[in-house]
Amino acid sequence: MANILNLKHLLTLALILLALATKSSTSSSSSITRVKGIYWLENPFFPPTTVDTSLFTHIFYSFLTPNNITYKLEISSSQILSLNTFTKTFKTKSPPAATLFSIGGAGSNSSLLAFIASDPPACAAFINSTIDVARTFGFDGIDLDWEFPKNTKEMNDLGEMLFQWRKAISDEGATTGRPPLLLTAAVYFAVNFSIYGEPRMYPVNSINENLDWVNVMSYELRGPRSNKTGAPSGTFDPKSNVSVVSGLLSWIHSGVVPEKLVMGMPLYGKSWKLRDPNVHGIGAPSVGSGPGVNGLMAYFQVLDFNRQKSAKVEYDVDTASVYSYSGSTWIGYDNPFTVSIKVGFAQALKLRGYFFWVAGLDTLDWKIATQASKAWKLV
């Protein structure tokens, strides 16, 4: 077993070194803006001023939603102040960071987005309002987080909407003489999937032609709703294709240009309650969630748990992830080491960059984000 584990470690190291070796071969794409992004949710305890822009190039304001009658973005009076503060903060920070606002999110009305994408007048009203909001509040771009188109028709409608969106952005830039707005989308960890609906695939050609990049949500892969523990954002999974690398490769094999892909990483872990505290590896039987809302624990909370409970911390070679356990509580998560592995693979695959979900969950000194930024700088 020791030899097998050592071999796996060596394979991981070899692939990271491959990323470093690609420096010369990627020089032709050096003009492309690399992405070190993070999503920010409205949080009085974590205002925009607390974000360290030396670690990030792009900050995503989350979330705005369209009105279900006018189909235009609905901006509340409180959001007006929040949006103004957000963009002004990141334009005046040193270094400054680009800002985008994100539309939708996990709790949004997927059916409304589906209707907007399918109805040309509604789609035009929606798109024009997004450009107006971006220019009014000084954003550099727009991000769509539609979770998720439910069938092939909705995917096709998404592709057409992206085409119309890009055209409107290009026309606005040509008319005003301003640099065109960025247009991005947050997408499922794999290019094709069947959860939350019928089997379907993202509109690859439209993504390549109309989006600056997609933020691939390479997390929420395992959770306490399952009856066994697992890596919430495992880099690998030898028993299935539910892993970060598998998902990214599905996008690349589908024809999406690697430099259109930005890998997502979570700043949180997921907790389980073990059925038997003496059985505590990956795949151990469980009986629901542990601490946190639905088992979600911020990275800083995981560290507090480890310290207060004198938890045992293990690195799992098969998934390149970390887990802690104490008593019946089991937590799967990423730490600076596993994030370095992921960044190495992102570079080996020649991705555009990475992003984190979500600001406020790292430690106060940004342990995870700092290590990711350092790892990326290696090339």
Swiss-Prot record:
InterPro entries referenced in this protein's UniProt entry, alphabetically:
Chitinase_II/V-like_cat, Chitinase_insertion_sf, Glyco_hydro18_cat, Glyco_hydro_18_chit_AS, Glycoside_hydrolase_SF, Glycosyl_Hydrlase_18
Write out the pathway annotation from the protein's UniProt entry.
Glycan degradation; chitin degradation
Q: What Gene Ontology molecular-function terms does this entry list?
A: chitin binding; chitinase activity; endochitinase activity
| Alphabetized Pfam families for the sequence | Glyco_hydro_18
Catalytic reaction annotation: Random endo-hydrolysis of N-acetyl-beta-D-glucosaminide (1->4)-beta-linkages in chitin and chitodextrins
Q: Which GO terms describe its cellular component?
A: extracellular region
* List of catalytic residues: E147
Q: Which residues are glycosylated?
A: N68, N109, N128, N192, N227, N241
Boundaries of every GH18 domain copy: 34-379
**Alphabetically, which GO biological process terms does the record hold?**
chitin catabolic process; defense response to fungus; polysaccharide catabolic process
Expression is induced as follows: Induced by the fungal pathogen Fusarium oxysporum.
Matching entries from CDD domains are given as: GH18_plant_chitinase_class_V (cd02879)
Q: What class of enzyme is it?
A: hydrolase
State which Enzyme Commission number(s) the record gives.
3.2.1.14
> What are the alphabetically sorted keywords of the record?
Carbohydrate metabolism, Chitin degradation, Glycoprotein, Glycosidase, Hydrolase, Plant defense, Polysaccharide degradation, Signal
- What start and end residues bound the annotated signal peptide? 1-26
Q: List the disulfide bonds.
A: none
According to its UniProt record, which protein family does this protein belong to? Answer: Belongs to the glycosyl hydrolase 18 family. Chitinase class V subfamily.
Q: What does this protein do?
A: Possesses chitinase activity in vitro toward glycol chitin, carboxymethyl-chitin, colloidal chitin, and the chitin oligosaccharides (N-acetylglucosamine) (GlcNAc)6 and (GlcNAc)5. Hydrolyzes (GlcNAc)6 into (GlcNAc)4 and (GlcNAc)2, or two (GlcNAc)3 molecules. Has the capacity to reduce hyphal growth of the fungus Trichoderma viride in an agar-plate bioassay.
Name the UniProt record assigns to this protein: Class V chitinase CHIT5b
